Amino acid sequence: MGDGLAGFGAVLQLLPPGSARVNTVRVLRDGEFVVAHSEYNFFGPKIGFDVFRFENGKIVEHWDYLQQKPTQPNPSGRTMTDGTAEVVDADKTGINKKLVADFVDVVLVHGRLHKLAGYFDGDNYLQHNPAIADGLSGLGAALKAMAEKGITMKYSRVHKILGEGNFVVVISEGEFAGQPTSFYDLFRVHKGKIVEHWDTIETILPKAEWKNQNGKFGF
């Protein structure tokens, strides 16, 4: 999408009249940033995260991360958007952001899987990824299945961490199945442990196909 209202309008003109729909399920605010977790009908059914940056009460910058909506729930019967939505524990925002930041850096970026269990309350972990079941056992089974198929996933850099209360969003860059990828992970924290997770995974287009030069990150 190109910059400005002109770029936004050009995309809208490509949509069939009246076809665009959005149902926002979660919203959180962190300073000048607002994050929305939504279900879309936008060139087909999708699940997405939008990040907006505000100045003087106006939206001045936007990032989005979209994934095709699955036709079936995940192995534990969960969708990509159901589950807890209420923001609570506002006084714990800072400590929850630090917990999740440590988890992503230690486990996802640096691959220290022996540290994994310390961030969770046993197997009490609700998973909304469309291919993974609940619990650390579900995550382990999914990673094993990926390895057997030769599918690799690598987080290489964290670009932004935003949070409010019990919710923390991590925006990262890496590779999935050999393709450059943006990872958008939303975690819910309860009593110092990660207890629920939602995400989108989106392949980053080659730069020659970009409609602007801002990139997927640029925070």
Across the structure, where does each feature detected by a protein language model lie?
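C-terminal and inter-domain tail/linker signature
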Residues: 1-219
